[in-house]
Amino acid sequence: MIFDHYAAEVALLLSDVRIGDLLEVAAGSGAVTRVLAASMPEHVSITATDLNQAMIDRAIKVGTARSVQWQQADVMDLSFSDASFDVVVCQFGAMFFEPKSDAFAEVFRVLRPGGQFLFSVWNSIDVNDFAREVIRSLAEYFPGNPPTFFERVPHGYHNRQIIGNDLAEGGFTSIPVLEEKSFTSRAPTALHLATAFCMGTPLRSEIEQRYQGDLGDVVNFVSASVERRFGSSNLEGKMSATFVNLKK
């Protein structure tokens, strides 16, 4: 629903990498990993990591077009030697790192001189249609105590000056290239979208803290709001993110 376009964009931005060692951090269930495994030359070794072993197990089960080294790893304390990789990639994970400068310092450490760091972050919730409508409807459902996770975390790290400062604190001295990319996100039904956001993301825990009844009640309310805004099926909405690209 939201990751495929950006995974393809990662592969495009790395299309000039023909040989070397690539590390992906916060790989999740492997959306980017699968695209890279299918598009990168065999001479580029791929190591994909995530903090959550369950996510790695899921990614392994789905499989990749060629061999990938999967490993559980914490980006705050990577188990790799200094100067081990030519490229480090992270799609939609940097927003969760805390403190971010420490994570960037680890990336800097494992990169070889001249190595490339490419990561993406979501832009403001105001320019991400589906997320904005979900949050708006939840604020209506929980007046006075709306869930704030999406605005604080996934859509809370897009200030270019702050990103640049965090990278500098992590040791990077080159000027990052920041490029905004917008695509159309699609969902088969309003219910599918509401379920994905409310049940399949950390937003669920915020809902559970506020409602002890059947979570289906909340999902149905959000679904109805989404349907009024986007229709009941074949939904389309704008999504917007920024790619940050720099060298060590």
Question: How would you name each of these model-derived features?
Answer:
Residues 116-143:
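Conserved class I S-adenosyl-L-methionine
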Residues 11, 34-37, 104-108, 135:
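A structural alpha-helix within SAM-dependent methyltransferase catalytic domains
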Residues 101-116:
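A short glycine-rich, Lys/Arg-flanked "PGG" loop and its adjoining helix->strand segment in the class I
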Residues 76-87:
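A short acidic, Gly/Pro-enriched loop at the edge of an enzyme's catalytic core
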Residues 2-20:
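Conserved alpha-helix/loop element of class I SAM-dependent methyltransferases that forms part
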Residues 86-100, 123:
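A short SAM/SAH-binding and catalytic strip from SAM-dependent methyltransferases
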Residues 29-31, 154-248:
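Conserved Class I S-adenosyl-L-methionine
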Residues 21-78, 102:
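Class I SAM-dependent methyltransferase SAM/SAH-binding core
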